């Protein structure tokens, strides 16, 4: 092969590289039906609905999927203050996939079991995002965090162990 042929091949390869990288990036960002189905499964078995979907435990999971993950205005109170289950439908629709991947693994206030997300594979965390994103935004934002001793204006569940009542004498 001559010098001109090598230069031509090198130019073609250099021009094709950005197109190849862009195609790969788009392929990774597109939610496949398998990702959405896997995300739905992980949300269901991971207990996400237990806190992030109103009345899910009380109705033994018999809540229409269209109502899933819209947050709950009942707080969880403990030494950390009062936290609320986020409306994941609004939160994830406001994030890029990359932002979700980074945020999902950061420590969160109790009682969120953030360490479960931390320990998942990237593929599983991505599938959860793609599933929730496929549901679209719905519902209202969750109430904001209230620090310890702050004024709580909603119902809340106290997450502090209580001593048993004293036995009658």
PLM region descriptions:
Residues 2-13:
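Bacterial N-terminal signal peptides that target proteins for export
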Residues 89-93, 102-104, 114-116:
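A structural feature that tracks compact, well-ordered secondary-structure segments
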């Amino acid at each position: 092969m001559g010098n001109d042929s090598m230069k031509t091949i090198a130019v073609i390869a250099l021009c094709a590289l950005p197109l190849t990288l862009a195609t790969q990036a788009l392929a990774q960002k597109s939610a496949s039906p398998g990702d959405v189905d896997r995300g739905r499964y992980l949300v269901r078995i991971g207990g996400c609905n237990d806190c992030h979907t109103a009345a899910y435990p009380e109705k033994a999971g018999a809540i229409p999927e269209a109502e899933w993950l819209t947050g709950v205005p009942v707080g969880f109170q403990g030494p950390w203050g009062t936290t609320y289950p986020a409306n994941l439908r609004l939160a994830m629709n406001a994030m890029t996939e990359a932002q979700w991947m980074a945020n999902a693994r950061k420590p969160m206030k109790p009682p969120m079991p953030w360490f479960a997300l931390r320990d998942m594979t990237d593929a599983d965390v991505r599938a959860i995002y793609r599933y929730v994103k496929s549901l679209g935004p719905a519902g209202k934002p969750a109430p904001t965090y209230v620090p310890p001793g702050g004024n709580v204006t909603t119902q809340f569940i106290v997450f502090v162990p209580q001593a048993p009542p004293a036995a009658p004498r």
